[in-house]
Amino acid sequence: MADSALIYLAPGAFQDALADARVLFQESRADSPRQGSLGEALEALSGRAVNLVVTSAEALLTGVTLSRKQARHLQRVLPYLLEEQLLEAPEQLWFASGKAEHGRYPVAVINRPNLEALIDLCREHRVRPQSLKADADLLAAQTPVLITVEGWGTLILERDQALVADEAQREAVLALHGDDELHFTRLEDPATLCDQLQAALAADHGVEMLQGAFSQRQNQASGPSPWQPWKPVMGLAAAVFFIALAAVWAQQWRYQKAADETFAQAAELYQS
């Protein structure tokens, strides 16, 4: 995963046409990140496995404390446990959980139709989504974090406390912290930002949202096949083959029937 391609979607990526959403993308950690639309990034990375990162504006990061017995039914109970934190109907959301620490499970929640649209767009471009995580989750170990890359301005105070904001809003929040501002991890250019995200992905930080029905195996199994363009031709060839086979079988049956009749007639003549 350390050398996988990266696509980092800007805040508000799902508000308009998804293919036109602004992204930072990187073919590998050794390459310089580029800015463009999601459609352009997927076109450039066609045939590749890609790590996808969304901002905290698109994913709710939280956690729940459960006993082992309760944890057996984690996926069933999450919508009820998080009901007060949800701004959308549970059936419109996808819930993903990570490994528990001292009985507390980290949870990531994302809009399900948005997730499905993102995966479908990847498949259209023959790109295999390998991972989907939130930036605040990946950078949680470095908090507080200040991202000042144009279009990605974000304040991450803790894993579950992040604010996507413009420069004026960020300055207002920073003013409340006074001298604490000096302790912020500052990510001020695309190269540094992508490098930190790639390092966190390589270290397997954060909750993986592509699990269950959206797992990597499912994405790979249902992804585009190189034989897809040939399927109509293969189907026609198969139909022609079976028609020809049926014709040969019918012809053999007629020959066999004629041979049997000839043999029967010969036997009658011989007996007479």
Task: Describe the residue ranges of each PLM region.
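Hydrophobic/aromatic-enriched cytosolic interaction surfaces used to assemble or bind macromolecules
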Residues: 1-272
